[in-house]
Amino acid sequence: MLPPALNIPKWLEENSHLLQPPVNNYCVYHPSSPATAGYTVMIVGGPNARTDYHINTTPEFFYQYRGSMLLKTVDTSVSPPVFQDIPIHEGSIFLLPANTPHCPVRFKDTVGVVMEQPRPKDAVDTMLWFCKKCGEVVWEKRFVCTDLGTQVKEVVEEFAADQEKRTCKACGTIAETRYQEGEVVQPPRFLE
């Protein structure tokens, strides 16, 4: 028997405490469940201000349920890399192509849904940090993603705990693990 549809307002009312930093997400449909056909569906809340970029070998589908978010992306096929910010407003959807470095920045009282298709067997995810002074990659970690909810958090914490990993080899700038107050501004469409 199939489960009932998920009512997002009711789920948030009962479970918003599960959206905790540093990732602020909860997998409502886990890929290990036979009913999901390997898909991952997450509810993600704000605020978060992590500076890491994630590379997934499959596309990611974003639906912004409440408020606006900013999806920071990088085109690494050119040198120097080109950084592009994509606002995703309440009620909007966005399909991020596979293998695109991205950093989803969510603001206070915002909620989104992210869906990832099944990863190919032994697909390698990458998390990386760019130097905000020179644009070079400061550090990256590759891993086979078996549990997005825990593995991303572990990599973020590993980077945060090691100043050597956070130091840019090109210019010596120490990378921050969070954006500073006012450094990233919520897209203006739904500001109060």
Curated annotation (Swiss-Prot):
Q: What does UniProt give as GO cellular component? A: cytoplasm
Can you list the disulfide-bonded cysteine pairs?
A: none
Q: Where in the cell is it found?
A: Cytoplasm
Q: Which Gene3D superfamilies match?
A: Jelly Rolls
Q: Which residues form a coiled coil?
A: none
Q: Which InterPro entries match?
A: 3hydroanth_dOase (IPR010329), RmlC-like_jellyroll (IPR014710), RmlC_Cupin_sf (IPR011051)
**Domain of life per record:** Eukaryota
Which residues bind Fe cation per the record?
H54, E60, H102
- Tell me the residue numbers annotated for binding a divalent metal cation: C131, C134, C168, C171
Q: What is its EC number?
A: 1.13.11.6
Q: Principal localization?
A: cytoplasm
Residues where substrate binds: E60, R106, E116
Q: Which residues bind O2?
A: R50
This protein's pathway reads: Cofactor biosynthesis; NAD(+) biosynthesis; quinolinate from L-kynurenine: step 3/3
A Gene Ontology biological process in which this protein takes part is: anthranilate metabolic process
Please list the cofactors this protein needs: Fe(2+)
Q: Which Pfam families match?
A: 3-HAO
Its UniProt entry gives the catalysed reaction(s) as:
3-hydroxyanthranilate + O2 = (2Z,4Z)-2-amino-3-carboxymuconate 6-semialdehyde
Write out the entry's keywords from A to Z: Cytoplasm, Dioxygenase, Iron, Metal-binding, Oxidoreductase, Pyridine nucleotide biosynthesis
Single annotated GO MF: ferrous iron binding
Q: What does this protein do?
A: Catalyzes the oxidative ring opening of 3-hydroxyanthranilate to 2-amino-3-carboxymuconate semialdehyde, which spontaneously cyclizes to quinolinate.
Q: Which family does it belong to?
A: Belongs to the 3-HAO family.
- List the protein's name: 3-hydroxyanthranilate 3,4-dioxygenase 1
What is the protein's species of origin? Aspergillus fumigatus (strain ATCC MYA-4609 / CBS 101355 / FGSC A1100 / Af293)
Q: Which gene produces this protein?
A: bna1-1
